[in-house]
Curated annotation (Swiss-Prot):
SUPFAM superfamilies: LanC-like
GO CC terms of this entry: plasma membrane
GO biological process: carbohydrate metabolic process; peptide modification
Signal peptide positions (record): none
CDD domains: euk_LANCL (cd04794)
Organism: Homo sapiens (Human)
Protein name listed in UniProt: LanC-like protein 3
Family annotation (Pfam families): LANC_like
InterPro entries, A to Z: 6hp_glycosidase-like_sf, LANC-like, LanC-like_prot_euk
Length: 420
């Protein structure tokens, strides 16, 4: 096997026993140490005069949940919700509040940017969603303030073409806004958008996809582009858009629901040897293929997981399982430890498959990938990180994965649940 993008997986597969060295007593200290390292590496958030604090805070908060300190706030929130770290809960939540408050100030004081105001992973919607979660976890009644700001952004992304680059994908578009609302519904145990708001956003996604498919003469009902590229993967593409529509399928008209299922099946037909190309119409080069959450099987698996959970049709679960097999072969990625295009993102596929099947083989595989993260081979051969604290590219996402490895019955890819 060529290993240009990944390390060779030399691990034996599951033989009936989990790894004793990946128990709570071994992993919890690694989590704590990694969190402390992340907190030490954070950029200054500013202080003193308001203007100076605003400038410094804005710089630290650039990158939204994906690459900024808002993502660290989410990681700390996630850790605080685990009973395994109950003694540190209040400290982590206070740190999370300090970080997310800085990001909220940056949203308020910064230059208004129509392109990112309603963005989930790269802008305001994600910041307000995490602020809501942190405030709620602290027992503060004023969690309704960031929640109100999140709700108000619904009007921003309701127009069909509210973004020139593409209005429907996960990072900055409507799928991301719906995903954030789904996270809030799950964590707060209440719907945060009205049925009318949900229907308006879903209808805009459907209308946009229909219009694009007709304009480009596609032989299938829904298609989208981002900066002119017809992506298929979870980061910017068709799979996560369809995943969000399935997550709100009860709000769709029966005829539109049928278009979504036709599009899901169309995407399933684009599979090439257990993987999908980054964009529609590409042919995968097996020796150099992308096997990432952002582009490829490890991210597209979540659409088919959702399709299986909604429909109970075995072909969707079978597709997920094939995604897992490819990820076991080629998921020890050289791009780092993160969840977007790193080892933790690959390993989350195994935790997803464990929850879908109950097969302990997948916990074992996730344990092996976790073990590999701390080997000299990985440290020496993986790409140097621009930001160790990034939720998606750095160690904050890795911390979320390690926590979930210890509680696999609740495990889910950060901010991307199919179980709601």
């Amino acid at each position: 096997m060529d290993t240009k993008r990944c390390f060779a997986n030399r691990f034996d597969d599951y033989q009936g026993s989990l790894l004793a060295g990946q128990c709570e007593e071994a992993v919890a200290p690694l989590v704590t140490a990694t969190i402390e390292r992340i907190l030490q590496e954070l950029p200054p958030l500013g202080g003193g005069a308001e203007a100076r604090g605003a400038t410094a805070g804005a710089s630290a908060c650039q990158g939204g949940l994906y690459g900024g300190v808002a993502g660290v706030a989410y990681m700390l929130y996630h850790v605080s919700q685990s009973p395994l770290f109950a003694t540190a809960r209040e400290r982590y939540l206070r740190s999370a509040k300090r970080l997310i408050d800085a990001c909220a100030r940056a949203e308020e004081w910064g230059e208004p940017d129509a392109d990112t105001r309603a963005a989930f992973l790269l802008g305001g919607a994600g910041v307000y969603a995490v602020a809501t979660l942190v405030y709620h976890a602290l027992g503060r009644s004023d969690y309704v303030q960031p929640l109100g700001k999140f709700r108000a952004l619904c009007a921003v992304c309701a127009p069909v073409s509210f973004l020139e680059c593409g209005s429907d994908e996960l990072f900055v578009g409507r799928a991301g806004y719906l995903c954030a609302a789904l996270v809030l519904k799950q964590k707060l145990a209440q719907e945060v958008l009205t049925p009318a708001q949900i229907k308006s956003i879903c209808q805009a996604i459907l209308d946009s996809g229909k219009q694009y498919a007709i304009k480009k003469r596609k032989p299938f009902p829904l298609m989208y582009s981002y900066y002119g590229t017809e992506y298929l993967g979870a980061a910017h593409g068709l799979s996560s858009i369809l995943q969000m529509l399935l997550s709100y399928h009860e709000h769709l008209k029966p005829s539109d629901r049928e278009l979504v299922w036709q599009s899901v099946d169309f995407l399933m037909e684009q599979e090439q040897n257990c993987n999908w190309p980054p964009e529609l119409g590409e042919t995968i080069e097996r020796e150099n293929e992308l096997v990432h959450w952002c582009h490829g099987a490890p991210g597209i698996a979540y659409l088919f997981a959702k399709a299986y959970l909604v429909s109970k049709k075995p072909q969707y679960l079978d597709t997920c399982i094939r995604c897992g097999e490819l990820t076991w072969q080629k998921g020890l990625l050289k791009k780092g430890p993160g969840i977007c295009h790193g080892v933790a993102g690959s390993a989350y596929v195994f935790l997803l498959l464990y929850r879908l099947t109950g097969n302990s083989k997948y916990i074992y595989r996730a344990q092996r990938f976790a073990q590999f993260l701390f080997t000299e081979e990985f440290k020496a051969g993986s790409r140097v990180l621009e930001s160790i604290y990034s939720l998606y590219e750095g160690f904050s996402g890795t911390v979320c994965f390690l926590i979930d490895l210890l509680q696999p019955n609740q495990a889910e890819f950060p901010l991307f649940s199919v179980f709601v």
